[in-house]
């Protein structure tokens, strides 16, 4: 098996399971790791989970698209979910999304304390205009990243 050193994280292989509904909670993350993934990424975690889009799948006549915007688990609930995910070993990357650099920094510090091995900044979301705008401006991405690091 091809071992990988990714940003100092020792992984048994280079397969990283991306954020999505299959990684919606600790059990899903743990199952992805048990299936052989080198690392897993949580669904995007936000500080306010009040918006709950349903249905989660949008069909346009040509195909279907997952339109679930982010995790419906409150930030404090991720302490338990990360413990479950990591109970079998493995690397868990927390994906976070926020409107301001300070909110990103808050989420990152919480998830680091909860046991996340790394943080992914989720700044591209075609369903949410404000985040789409963020993703198209390198200077804004720089400022958000600087606040988290």
Task: Cite the ranges covered by each PLM segment.
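Active-site entrance/lid segments in N-terminal catalytic domains of soluble metabolic enzymes
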Residues: 3-11, 16-22, 26-149
């Amino acid at each position: 098996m091809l071992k990988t050193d990714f940003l100092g994280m020792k992984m048994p292989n280079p397969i990283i399971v991306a954020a999505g509904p299959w990684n919606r909670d600790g059990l899903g993350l743990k199952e992805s790791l048990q299936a052989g993934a080198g690392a897993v990424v949580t669904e995007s975690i936000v500080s306010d989970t009040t918006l709950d889009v349903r249905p989660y799948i949008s069909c346009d006549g040509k195909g279907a698209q997952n339109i679930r915007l982010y995790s419906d688990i409150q930030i404090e609930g991720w302490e338990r979910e990360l413990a479950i995910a990591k109970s079998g070993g493995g690397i868990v990357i927390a994906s976070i999304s926020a409107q301001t650099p300070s909110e990103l920094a808050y989420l990152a510090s919480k998830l680091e304390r909860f046991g996340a091995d790394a943080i992914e900044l989720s700044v591209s979301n075609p369903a949410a205009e404000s985040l789409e705008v963020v993703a198209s401006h390198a200077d804004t991405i720089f400022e958000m990243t600087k606040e988290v690091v």
